[in-house]
Amino acid sequence: MTKIYNLAILPGDGIGPELLQKDLNFKVLKEQYKLKINTTEYDIGGIAIDKYGKALPKETLDGCKESDSILFGSVGGPKWQHLPPDQQPERAALLPIRKYFNLFSNLRPAKLYSTLNHLSPLRRDISEKGFDILCVRELTGGIYFGKPKGYIKNIIDKKAFDTEIYYASEIKRIAHIGFKLAQNRKYKITSVDKANVLESSVLWRETVNTISKEYPDVKLSHLYIDHAAMQIIKNPDKFDVILTSNLFGDILSDECAMITGSIGMLPSASLNDSNFGLYEPAGGSAPDIAGKNIANPIAQILSIAMLVRYTMKLPMISDHIESAVIDTLKKGYRTLDIANDKEKYVSTNDIGDIISDILKKRI
């Protein structure tokens, strides 16, 4: 019997709705690849605050529970920045979903395409070497979720505090993910910590070293976070899989994204043990360009490719989607964010249609 995939679609705010409108609409996957896909749309983020008074309504969470995975757009914008931090869309919508579904593994690929080499802020002699980095970030532990935390204002010298806590079991499970991914790439993994200062990083390094013995074919190296940040700028081509904690991964994955030249090209997947995932573009809601039909949908489309690879377990189809994106770029099609002064750019809708047409021809 053909598997039926039920997907929760969460467009959110800003450019999210228009990008998910051009997400191939799953039409190609349904018609050309004969996949059985049901999609249901739910409100999240600022638009949900306006309608329901909260960023993550019960109806949305219940819908996600009934789904095989989530395709997410973006949340947030100036309209809701006056709210207390724990009620703002970015924090009140995403963090509870990550915690509820135990989405402990965040995968953020950062690839510099040869056709877009000129966009990288790196020196030309560095960018010309290219790079293809996969950041594997532990997503549900560490300082973002550690207790106690607080902000004490009713004293002369105000103070605030957060707690970085990791259990060995949390480190083990993300380490296994990282090593297995490295086995499907270049058999090389770099673990990033601050073991010269932080006790949590001492445990991190000890645990990763222990897990590495189960993967003798993968070469493991360690870097401190400050040195890793420097080396990503200096020698990005030397990296393959980067394995790191929640806080450090938050920083390094954005650094890797920006040296590609456009965050609008980069997808993201957050997964649990059962292949349930939240798939989203790495960029934000970009309210300044929302509704103008100029946003880059490629990150959203590549997020679908990740969904097909990791939840549906159909790597060949995922490869086809990624190849269609590469061919589109080789043919010279660009959205505004990746076009230079001499190139004519196409709209959000147009580039989505072009990628779909190329994908159809691959079958």
Swiss-Prot record:
Compartmental location: Cytoplasm
Q: What cellular-component terms does GO give this entry?
A: cytosol
Q: What is its main location?
A: cytoplasm
Q: What Pfam families does its record include? A: Iso_dh
**Record key words, sorted:** Amino-acid biosynthesis, Branched-chain amino acid biosynthesis, Cytoplasm, Leucine biosynthesis, Magnesium, Manganese, Metal-binding, NAD, Oxidoreductase
Q: Which cofactor does it need?
A: Mg(2+); Mn(2+)
Residue numbers binding substrate = R98, R108, R137, D226
One GO term of the biological process aspect: L-leucine biosynthetic process
Q: How does it assemble?
A: Homodimer.
**Similarity comment:** Belongs to the isocitrate and isopropylmalate dehydrogenases family. LeuB type 1 subfamily.
Protein name per the record: 3-isopropylmalate dehydrogenase
- Report the source organism: Buchnera aphidicola subsp. Pemphigus spyrothecae
Its gene name is: leuB
